[in-house]
Amino acid sequence: MALFSDVFRQTNAYAMQLGGILGLYWCLGLLCMVAGFQVSFLHSLVPVIILGAPLLGYFLARYFEGQVRADAPVDFVRAFLFCYLMYLYATVILGGVTYIYFTMFDEGSLIEANIAQLQRPEMKELLSSPQIQSQINEALTTTGFKSLEEMFRSVTPLMLAANIVDLNLLIGVILSIPTAFFIKTKPIRK
């Protein structure tokens, strides 16, 4: 029987390796989102990558279960721990890449592209509806900004990276529960 520390060490090692693969996949999604403002085809890949991420997470977790099954059966707790750690390491990679990209390379182009989207006629029409306008006015009053453009320009690279990390940590916990349920080692029936 394996010791808990050995099982944890093995689970953590696999989570780091496979979380790295998942993190690079998420970075590909970030690249498609950012480059999609210049090449619209790449923007259309973003939903595919987002929807494919849980599937990739499932297949990576299934790979983990297949690799360690002989050492010790993977119960729900170990499967959840692996999945959570895998998503955690992927989030760290994506957060770091996001911060580096927006600090060193973006130079505000993503914010400017979003501001340009606000100037499109269909967006102006949508934003001028009474319900949306009241929400915008409430947000501007609460935050002290004079316009949406000013609010967008106030977003720092650290804020973008922190939001991505927060969101992905939450999603990681949520996705870890069903993934762990499906990948745990099934008992052999005699």
Task: Say what each PLM segment does.
Residues 1-70:
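Transmembrane alpha-helical insertion/packing segments
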Residues 21, 25-29, 53, 90-98, ...:
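Alpha-helical transmembrane segments of multipass membrane proteins
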Residues 96-135:
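Functional transmembrane-helix hotspots
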Residues 141-170:
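Individual transmembrane alpha-helix segments
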